């Protein structure tokens, strides 16, 4: 699980989990406190996908697409709202894509050292942030 800012900067990366683990379970285990010392924390928005259904941490406004009801359909207003949320969330998906440009992240890591997965992800996120920083400081002609 990672948290990215609107400028694609990766702010937080959880430890890696082996196998398939539900996003909400990872979020619950991380027990994050958003903006605990920020006086404007009510204005923090957490954009999350449907994998985090039911995850509502304190101190933030949760923005999540509406799930299609079982055997039903979403209204046009709900579909429009979901599209608007997706337009905002695409920044996070681009940040994840920026981390996954590194071959070692894309492929399965076969190692007896379980900490290696975490280290590879930390390094990939650090390189992603470094790349963003270099782009912002580059001289454009």
Where are these regions (language model features)?
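Short, well-ordered secondary-structure "scaffold" segments embedded in the functional core
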Residues: 1-141
